[in-house]
């Protein structure tokens, strides 16, 4: 009996998805198709139909544990090319490999995003960002497959409507990212170092540019201290990174919170108001690092209170229960409802 195919691509049956995600929870897929070329992705996605799940690095997704009869198309096209100051990455390329390749060619601009797990194709969906930078700063265009029609086209940043940790792609299954192009600094300067903690680590002024290799090294060190660099032996890294986004509140709301707390509230300027540090809110609401304790299957990282981690035996239900407890506790303490950063598939808070 021959191997079954989907869109001309071999199908694996009854495949556990937990090992394919950084949180290491999820269901068993009835069918898994792994595509190593962009053409294979297009053919497999169109053959699989609108209900198929698209999965790449699995670093920013929480999968329902009880999903049944699931077909998954896994993006494993990994080519990275550099032409002058333009870096083009296929969707399945490891994100940190893209950053490293850009720096190897003397290009600055992505170094603040070093060490973020996952794939290049996920970055425009989420408008991935860290340490004062986000991919919207450098994306030139994105190649998309429209699932309803099968058409493939390049789109501009204007089409993508980037926002804080979001884009037009995040809340729609209509589009599949195939490739991403970045326009970088050919002179080899880093992006401006906007984040205070990173500037302190580098001993530079906020807003200053410096050697991007130094920035990368500093970012990787900072991330490692917080358990934000993947390590299979360290359960503090079995997560989706920061589980909640930093909330943006009005100036009046910020002043109300500051008056309630009676001490300095970490904050940052934002277009629509004041951005608060979600990790600080979580800890101030009573959820310290490691909550609720060593015996819990899911708990906050011992290094970073904003990361919800799988201690080795957690299920999706365990992770979501912890997330609800933290979200509701912050709402009770401050009147602010935190928004989850990862994409929740087949489940909700």
UniProtKB/Swiss-Prot annotation:
Its main location: cytoplasm. Keywords: Cell cycle, Cell division, Cell shape, Cell wall biogenesis/degradation, Cytoplasm, FAD, Flavoprotein, NADP, Oxidoreductase, Peptidoglycan synthesis. It is an enzyme of class 1 (oxidoreductase). PANTHER family: UDP-N-ACETYLENOLPYRUVOYLGLUCOSAMINE REDUCTASE (PTHR21071:SF4). GO terms for cellular component: cytosol. InterPro entries: FAD-bd_PCMH (IPR016166), FAD-bd_PCMH-like_sf (IPR036318), FAD-bd_PCMH_sub1 (IPR016167), FAD-bd_PCMH_sub2 (IPR016169), MurB (IPR003170), MurB_C (IPR011601), MurB_C_sf (IPR036635), Oxid_FAD_bind_N (IPR006094). The active site is at residues 165, 242, 341. GO terms for molecular function: FAD binding; UDP-N-acetylmuramate dehydrogenase activity. Its EC number is 1.3.1.98. It is found in: Cytoplasm. One of its GO terms (biological process) is cell wall organization. It comes from the Bacteria. SUPFAM superfamilies: FAD-binding/transporter-associated domain-like (SSF56176), Uridine diphospho-N-Acetylenolpyruvylglucosamine reductase, MurB, C-terminal domain (SSF56194). Residues 25-213 form the FAD-binding PCMH-type domain. Cell wall formation. It catalyses: UDP-N-acetyl-alpha-D-muramate + NADP(+) = UDP-N-acetyl-3-O-(1-carboxyvinyl)-alpha-D-glucosamine + NADPH + H(+). This is UDP-N-acetylenolpyruvoylglucosamine reductase. It holds the Pfam family MurB_C. Pathway: Cell wall biogenesis; peptidoglycan biosynthesis. The lineage of its organism: Bacteria, Bacillati, Actinomycetota, Actinomycetes, Mycobacteriales. Belongs to the MurB family. Its cofactor is FAD.
